[in-house]
């Protein structure tokens, strides 16, 4: 549940905000069934609330609740309670204060979780507001204390202290209509009109109620696939160029109806999965560097439309990163299956990710054993996709089919766990951002699917003999630039198509077309692509 509010101070009569001054979502959160039974939980599993409050009075500016807790409904009672508690300094930073509330007093705020809670608070040098979080007191250790400090420092909360602005125009609704018309990917059984739009609007109001630039996060642009039948090379090409231009255009089109506009943060998941998808860590880093270079060439001067960050950025930035001790995650084993070259820093990030944000606790293993379970469907989808993607990888060429399938199953299992953990991390770092995705979603929230390349820019085809766009309802197989390449067919239409590189190569080999691959020109911002012409 999310609140954004300017509550009356404790000196005022009212103890609850007017309905128009906060927003809340009533969706069933995925984290309400996290067990608190003495198990060694990830730090994410311990988070119950993340908030910002005034340094002058008891007002809260924003509040993100988890695990069905009730801090927002009883905010002044909660604040008065913790004011009466003694505080101490965190072991990892004297700038973080900690208070412990016993389970008997915490239950009314935690919906009777039956555990004591820790309230940690911190103020950044560049802010006046107080940042705070509430975590359960279970299996306390130095890593958990560091992770809390890191989230308090790095979570994107700086806009919370901006005041609510009264506007006659319902910009949140205009933005929802804009998103639906210009970006949203619609699938069968789409839930946008059955609760999804309402959820989207409530998330948008964190920005529109303050009349600030709307910010979205898009986990995407990891690296090129290792499968040479899908892509042509390992650096960004025309596909990435078209995708970046589409996102830039969307941010500028929104300005026409919402002047503060929009910024999209591309949160690369390349180093999350690189060793699972058969790509060396340094290849991911090179792809990312080249993507930034391409963006600089296609960006509109003076317009901050797109920002970039990745796994290493999320962990090795800010004050807390300077006091991190790798020994804290030495017990975390990250399995590698594809024989790729591993970067120590990236692997350390993966260790931190899994220790800090893995919420599996053995549930995935049980879920994929249940016929018809949604997670079993996801697991099988990952397995099919990775079976195809890694089929040509040199590391597996000596494997029997049985052994290959077994490894693929292990890879799919680990990818789901890492994907969940990364999603949890993004949720903590970007608690109020709109979450958009390159995967198909039912659009009920919290994630909303988009097509990074529009049909107007480039048609998606599975064959050059049939240029009609195929239908994609599999949540894993919405076509992306990093699993395909772009081909320009020189005829009277001069049209671009997105397809597998194998399709183009076979058409050239069969003599159906004549053409070449044009390399990416990073100096002028022109992405690489095939240029072909049909032979009469």
From Swiss-Prot:
Can you cite a GO biological process for this protein? ascospore wall assembly
Instruction: State the Pfam families in the record.
Output: DIT1_PvcA
Positions of region (Disordered): 1-23
Q: Does the keyword Aminoacyl-tRNA synthetase apply?
A: no
Q: Which keywords belong to this entry?
A: Sporulation
Q: Name one GO molecular function term.
A: catalytic activity
What do the Gene Ontology cellular component annotations say?
Answer: ascospore-type prospore; cytosol
Q: What does this protein do?
A: Involved in spore wall maturation. Catalyzes a two step reaction that leads to the LL-dityrosine containing precursor of the spore wall.
> Which protein are we looking at?
Spore wall maturation protein DIT1
Species for this entry? Saccharomyces cerevisiae (strain ATCC 204508 / S288c) (Baker's yeast)
């Amino acid at each position: 549940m999310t609140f954004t509010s300017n509550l009356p101070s404790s000196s005022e009569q009212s103890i609850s905000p007017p309905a128009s001054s906060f927003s809340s979502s009533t969706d069933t959160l995925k984290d309400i069934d996290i067990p608190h039974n003495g198990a060694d939980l990830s730090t994410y599993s311990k988070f119950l609330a993340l908030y910002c409050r005034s340094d002058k009075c008891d007002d809260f500016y924003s509040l993100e609740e988890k695990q069905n807790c009730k801090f927002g409904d009883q905010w002044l009672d909660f604040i008065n309670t913790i004011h009466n508690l003694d505080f101490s300094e965190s072991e990892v930073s004297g700038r973080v204060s900690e208070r412990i509330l016993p389970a008997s007093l915490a239950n009314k705020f935690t919906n009777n979780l039956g555990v004591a809670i820790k309230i940690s608070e911190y103020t950044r040098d560049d802010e006046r507001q107080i940042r705070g979080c509430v975590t359960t007191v279970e299996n306390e250790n130095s890593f958990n204390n560091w992770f809390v400090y890191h989230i308090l420092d790095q979570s994107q909360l700086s806009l919370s202290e901006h005041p609510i602005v009264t506007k006659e125009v319902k910009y949140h609704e205009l933005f929802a209509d804009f998103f639906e018309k210009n970006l949203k990917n619609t699938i069968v059984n789409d839930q946008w009109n059955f609760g999804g739009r309402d959820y989207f609007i409530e998330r948008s109001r964190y920005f529109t109620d303050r009349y600030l630039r709307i910010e979205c996060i898009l986990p995407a642009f990891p690296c090129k696939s290792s499968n040479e039948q899908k892509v042509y090379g390992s650096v960004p090409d025309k596909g990435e160029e078209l995708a970046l231009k589409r996102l830039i255009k969307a941010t500028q089109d929104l300005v026409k109806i919402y002047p503060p506009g929009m910024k999209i943060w591309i949160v690369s998941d390349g180093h999350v999965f690189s060793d699972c998808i058969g790509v060396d860590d340094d290849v991911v880093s090179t792809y990312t560097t080249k993507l930034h270079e391409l963006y600089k060439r296609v960006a509109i001067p003076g317009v901050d439309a797109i920002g970039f960050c990745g796994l290493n950025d999320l962990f090795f930035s800010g004050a807390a990163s300077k006091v991190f001790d790798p020994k804290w995650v030495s017990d975390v084993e990250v399995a590698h299956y594809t024989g790729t070259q591993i970067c120590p820093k990236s692997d350390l990030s993966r260790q931190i990710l899994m220790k800090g944000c893995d919420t599996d606790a053995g549930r995935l293993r049980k879920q994929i054993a249940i016929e018809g379970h949604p997670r079993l469907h996801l697991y099988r989808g990952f397995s099919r996709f990775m079976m195809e993607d890694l089929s040509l990888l040199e590391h597996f060429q000596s494997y029997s089919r049985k052994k290959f399938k077994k490894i693929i199953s292990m890879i799919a299992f680990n990818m789901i766990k890492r994907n969940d953990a990364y999603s949890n991390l993004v949720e903590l770092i970007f608690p109020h951002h709109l979450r958009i995705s390159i995967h198909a979603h039912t659009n009920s929230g919290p994630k909303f699917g988009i097509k990074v390349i529009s049909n107007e820019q480039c048609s998606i085809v599975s064959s050059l003999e049939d240029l009609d766009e195929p239908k994609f309802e599999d949540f894993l197989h919405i076509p992306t630039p990093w699993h395909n390449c772009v081909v320009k067919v020189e005829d009277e239409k001069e049209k671009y198509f997105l397809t597998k590189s194998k399709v183009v190569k076979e058409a050239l080999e069969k003599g159906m077309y004549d053409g070449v691959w044009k390399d990416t020109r990073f100096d002028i911002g022109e992405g690489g692509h095939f240029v072909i012409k049909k032979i009469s």
